[in-house]
Amino acid sequence: MTEITETKKEADTPIIPKNTNTTATTTPTTKQQPTKLISDEVEKDTSKVDFTKGGVEEFKFYPDNPKSHRHKYKWSMKEPSKFYDPCEESRMASMDCLYRNQDDKYACQEFFDAYRECRKDFFRKKRQDNRDGAKGWGW
């Protein structure tokens, strides 16, 4: 009869493998902050914005940086049915202009042109990377 009770006690105790550590670790997990790159930020201080940097072929009439490598990563990581806009700052500026001018699109035409140019530059970079065989766009 004592054998039966000992078997029940053994069945009630959990089986712990010998190689595992049963003490709880209390060390906090530190999460590394991603490094910020200069190309990640949009300059909001108007005194520091230089649209003519690099010569005539590099003129830029919008605050965004559509040629940034971060856009390639964000574009490839989005879900197929989701929308990603690399020129969000220009889009928001054109929409704010519409709100200020009571939906008068002709008053905000320069903002819309800047947004269109930003989108063209982004897709031009995407096509050029495709021609050059650069990977990372999700194809």
UniProtKB/Swiss-Prot annotation:
Main subcellular location: mitochondrion
Record's compositionally biased regions (Low complexity): 13-35
Cysteine pairs bridged by disulfides in the record: C87-C118, C97-C108
Gene: COX23
Biased segments, Basic and acidic residues type: 1-12
GO cellular component: mitochondrial intermembrane space
Leader sequence residues: none
Protein name as it appears in the record: Cytochrome c oxidase-assembly factor COX23, mitochondrial
Residue ranges of the motif Cx9C motif 2: 108-118
Similarity comment text for this entry: Belongs to the COX23 family.
Taxonomy, superkingdom: Eukaryota
PROSITE patterns per UniProt: CHCH
Species classification: Eukaryota, Fungi, Dikarya, Ascomycota, Saccharomycotina
Gene Ontology BP, a term: mitochondrial cytochrome c oxidase assembly
Domain (CHCH) ranges: 84-126
Protein function: Required for the assembly of cytochrome c oxidase.
InterPro entries in the cross-refs: COX23, Cys_alpha_HP_mot_SF
Residue span of motif Cx9C motif 1: 87-97
Annotated region (Disordered), positions in chain: 1-40
PANTHER family in UniProt: COILED-COIL-HELIX-COILED-COIL-HELIX DOMAIN-CONTAINING PROTEIN 7
Location relative to the cell: Mitochondrion intermembrane space
Keywords from the UniProt entry: Disulfide bond, Mitochondrion, Transit peptide
